[in-house]
């Protein structure tokens, strides 16, 4: 539960689960596993994203955020491919923002909004 979690961990779980639920509600082709089931390297990377997104250097637009997301995934060894494959680290959204479909752009906008909510309302 949140009692033993750091501020960044609480914010990360809120943003991640909010984005996951939004993807599910939109019938997105990729709905992430729950936070509790994600692998440790992913969680560590996501904590860094949330730390940045809740700080002064945050991405303020979905396009800027998508670029940061792509960089983080490439650093974790992911590649572009037409079909999502978590085991082989292949993701169809590893393309420039302009090449994303509307659903993926909307998901990025929701993520930016969730980060802003977490930044302003989840406090110590």
Predicted regions and their residues:
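Alpha-helical propensity feature that highlights long, continuous alpha-helices across diverse contexts
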Residues: 1-124
């Amino acid at each position: 539960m949140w009692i033993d979690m750091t501020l960044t961990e609480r914010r990360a779980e809120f943003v991640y689960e909010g984005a996951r639920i939004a993807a599910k509600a939109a019938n997105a082709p990729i709905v992430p596993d729950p936070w509790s089931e994600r692998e440790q390297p992913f969680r560590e990377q996501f904590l860094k994203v949330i730390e940045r997104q809740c700080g002064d250097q945050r991405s303020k637009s979905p396009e800027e955020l998508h670029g940061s997301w792509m960089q983080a995934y490439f650093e974790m060894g992911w590649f572009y491919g037409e079909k999502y494959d978590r085991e082989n680290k292949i993701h169809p959204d590893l393309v420039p923002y302009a090449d994303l479909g509307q659903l993926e752009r909307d998901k990025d906008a929701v993520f930016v909004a969730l980060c802003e909510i977490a930044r302003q309302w989840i406090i110590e």
